């Protein structure tokens, strides 16, 4: 594709963390094709982050019923979708497509350059997920590694809080209970911090974390916390960006906080750290040989204060 024009489509489903780990793909495409229209086909609630942060120009929903036809062998494909795909010079797909049915059907739309990326990075390697997701760009002669997801543009849009309290954003949940620090530890730590009226907790919770978020909120004084339940992701991002510190687990929200550049303390469980940890000098990971239950409130307090004091 000519570096001064053309259109590139990146197809990426997945949850919040999966998408944020793919942001460096958009960042590199924007760097090497600055004048090219860059579009994302994904879940709008998540993919809109790429548009609002300036890495993509437009977002289209992957949840359209018409796309189902593209996963059927020799099935009739909707003309409107064929026309849509025909507009792009390069299509990079991270969809699970083991039999190449989707690719075969999309290629009916024209002679664009189709690049298949990994649906999910390999947990059994030592290669970070970001570098795995960047590998397809080698077909475009882009070989950069070590990239960090960057949502700093969203952070710059955040107006600093006028109140004098120090805001700490926390996410007491994740996609799996095995990745969570025990809720009683969260409660103990937050209650101890709330004894200092200087701190205010912003609790982030989605549908999967509802119980953890609500339970923790009930155990904290009203003046010491706010609860953001099922808040739209760009709004959550801006709220986290206004925080002095983020504390969470191996979750998409932790990747979001890291991408915003917020000093982050991540309590790590059983997942492969080399592959999945949020990147950045401002990110500190705590893990224990005894698992998450081996992480103490005292450890978390010590690291939290160090990060809020500007430590790294």
Language-model regions, residue ranges each:
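Catalytic machinery of carbohydrate-active enzymes
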Residues: 1-312
